[in-house]
Amino acid sequence: MGQTITEKIFSEHAGKKVHAGEIVRVDIDMIIGNDITTPISIRAFEESGAEKLARPDNFSIVMDHYIPAKDIASANQAKISREFAYKHDLKYFFDEKDMGIEHALLPEKGLVIPGDVIIGADSHTCTHGALGAFSTGMGSTDLAFGMITGGNWFKVPETIKVVLTGKSGEHIYGKDIILELIRILGVDGALYKALEFTGDAIQHLAMDDRFSMCNMAIEAGAKSGIIAVDNITEAYLIERAEANGGLRSEPKIHYSDEDATYCQVVTIDVENLSPVIAYPFLPSNGKPVEQAVKDDLKIDQVMIGSCTNGRIEDLRIAAEIMKGKRVAKHTRMIVTPATQKILMQAQHEGLMDILIEAGAVVSNPTCGACLGGYMGILGDGERCVATTNRNFVGRMGARTSEIYLANSAVAAASAIAGKIVDPREI
C-alpha cells in the first residue's frame, strides 16, 4: 500500500512504516511557543520537576502577540518567557530586537525544513506545511510534554487530496483558493485530516501564496496543510540558506506515492475563480467579490497583515494599487508587516512611502489587531476588510463588528473606495 507525504514523514520519525489511523510517538524537530501560550507551558514544565529541556536546539519562543507590551498584564506575561529563555540560554528566542509573527519569522530564519515534524502552541502552526513539513498546532500542556521529552504522541491523520487545476487570473491568490476550499468543506469538513495541495496550478503559486493556503487549513478543521517540495520551494530554501548562513538541518523530501490512499479528493479550477470574500461570521462564508460589490458594503477599516497575508508580496500588491491614491475619507487603513525583515524590505522598495502617503498607518510586526489584542480594535457596528484568517463574532473587537476576509488586492482597493470593490475594476 502506497503512502501520502504525511504518512512518510511519520514513518521516518517513528522508525517504522505507518498509515493513517495508527497512534505513534515521534521526536519533534521544532517546538514553537509565543508570548501568550509559552507561560502556560513553562508552568507545566516546572511543575513536572523538569530542570532541562530535552532538546534545547529544537525549542523556539517568538514574542509576537502583545509585543511591545500593550499593558502591565502583557508585560508581566512576556517577562515569564524572557526569564525562561535567558535561564536556558535558548538559541531560538526572538524578542523585540528581531521580531516577527512566528509563522512568518521561522521560515524566514531557515528554521523550517522539509520533512520536519513541527508543533506549536498556536493553531496556525499548520502554515509551515508549505515547505513540505508536517506542522500542527497543539495545546500548551502538549507543548510542555514536548519540552520535557523531546517528542509527542500523534494519531497519523488521513489525507484529503486537494487538486488545483488551471492558472489563476488577475488578482487571484492563494488566499482566494483557500477561502474557496473552506467554503466547499465547511469549518469542520477536514477535521483531523491533512490537506495535501496538488495539481498543475501549484507551479504557478509563489511561496507567499502557499504559506497563506497552509496557514488557513485549520479553518476547515484540518490537522495540517502540506505541499510537496518543488523548484519554487527549493529556490526559497536556497535564498533562506544564503541569508542565514545555512538552514537548521538538511531537508528530507518526501512525495506521495501514486497509489497512496486519500479519504477524499477535492478539485478546484482556479482559472474560473473570482476574488473570494468570506462574510461574517465564519471563514466558510465565502462569496465571489461580485456579490460583495452588489451588496454595497461600506467599510470603516482595512487591515493588511497577519501570519496569513503580511508578507512582502502582499505589501507589493497593496502599494501597486494604492500608488498616487488616498484611503477614503471615512475609512482607516492599518498595515502590519509580518516581520522586521519584511518591513525593511518594503522600506527599501519604497512601498512604505506609497502606503503612508495614501493614508495608511504602518505598525511594527505583531499579531495585534488580528486577534483583537490591540493596534486596530473595532468598535460597535464597525465593518473591516482584513487579510487575516478568522472572522468570528468579536474576533477583532466589539461583538457587533464585522470582518470580511479577503486578499490584499481586495483590501487595498476597498480602502481607496471606502467599500468592498473588485480590484480588477480599479
From Swiss-Prot:
Sorted UniProt keywords: 4Fe-4S, Amino-acid biosynthesis, Branched-chain amino acid biosynthesis, Iron, Iron-sulfur, Leucine biosynthesis, Lyase, Metal-binding
Cofactors, names only: [4Fe-4S] cluster
Protein function: Catalyzes the isomerization between 2-isopropylmalate and 3-isopropylmalate, via the formation of 2-isopropylmaleate.
A GO molecular-function descriptor: metal ion binding
Pfam entry (one): Aconitase
Name of encoding gene: leuC
GO biological process: L-leucine biosynthetic process
UniProt pathway: Amino-acid biosynthesis; L-leucine biosynthesis; L-leucine from 3-methyl-2-oxobutanoate: step 2/4
Protein name listed in UniProt: 3-isopropylmalate dehydratase large subunit
CDD domains in the record: IPMI (cd01583)
Protein species of origin: Sulfurovum sp. (strain NBC37-1)
InterPro entries attached to this UniProt entry: Acnase/IPM_dHydase_lsu_aba_1/3 (IPR015931), Acoase/IPM_deHydtase_lsu_aba (IPR001030), Aconitase_4Fe-4S_BS (IPR018136), Aconitase_4Fe-4S_dom (IPR036008), HAcnase/IPMdehydase_lsu_prok (IPR011826), Homoacnase/IPMdehydase_lsu (IPR006251), IPM_dehydratase_rel_enz (IPR050067), IPMI_cat (IPR033941)
